[in-house]
């Protein structure tokens, strides 16, 4: 086994696809990466809440009162009253009848998809969906048809031509994590109605960022009351904490409690995390200026990059990719940016399609206009050095 896996590691290295862990300590708009302070353009901490003192104090208070860990799964003796408080806050925020917290976005997607989708169902999935959605669909053992990214015409054609099934599912990210573009939810809802399907939306990168009170993209488009729509969200990005959730009707939550294996067979979240989650939900609603600032900074950053000639794809969110192409050039650009004090990571296949390696930048409300302008100057210089722009 050692020889075989060592050969594979060497292959990845030759293709500039080998990854490594780097020591990182993030605080506000800054990250100390391998001992060097840098402007953090690689974080999903969109609203700058990860080191907000109110989340920290809520977590510390809960840890002092209730201990460091849950000690059991939710269905045994790990369902702490703080779960009820956080889920009640979720229901109020999302205007939902019921809510259920999972340990992470990955386990939420795996758990929900495998619990609800069966072998006799058909799934229609955007080709650029997150790995957790892809894995959940695979584990469900349902037949899956992948449609080209955002290609509504192809999706409708697949729905029309598909064989009879117990249930049809359309599965999509709300905001695509490597491209920064938004799912055409209004058109997907129309197809869901027309072909009597269920729409499952992963709001990981849209929760806290879009919607009147940061509820997400479904609320942004006024689709939150639509029937046969399931929304999954996370606490680990804009909300600055950890964990994930599903919101919907009571029967859905009750069914998941009894069937979602990733919920049933894992230790519950620590009380400190649950307390921070509840605090974050209230802050997101009470401080809309964080979202306003985030969108203004994102627009400033994206506009400046486009004017310089960079390809930012279809980005319309705080996630702004610069498409580079070859893996080695993306790695070289990332290294040059880090030398200049900008933390930005090269994203390569299989995370993105072959030939589309990129630097994935993400903007946060913790940044300033000066941070944005300095970053753009550094990106321009790095882009010129690798021949990406003239």
UniProtKB/Swiss-Prot annotation:
It comes from the Bacteria. Keywords: Biotin biosynthesis, Pyridoxal phosphate, Transferase. Its EC number is 2.3.1.47. The modification N6-(pyridoxal phosphate)lysine is found at residue 237. One of its GO terms (biological process) is biotin biosynthetic process. Pyridoxal 5'-phosphate binds at residues 105-106, 177, 202-205, 234-237. It catalyses: 6-carboxyhexanoyl-[ACP] + L-alanine + H(+) = (8S)-8-amino-7-oxononanoate + holo-[ACP] + CO2. Pathway: Cofactor biosynthesis; biotin biosynthesis. Homodimer. Catalyzes the decarboxylative condensation of pimeloyl-[acyl-carrier protein] and L-alanine to produce 8-amino-7-oxononanoate (AON), [acyl-carrier protein], and carbon dioxide. Belongs to the class-II pyridoxal-phosphate-dependent aminotransferase family. BioF subfamily. This is Putative 8-amino-7-oxononanoate synthase. It comes from Geobacillus kaustophilus (strain HTA426).
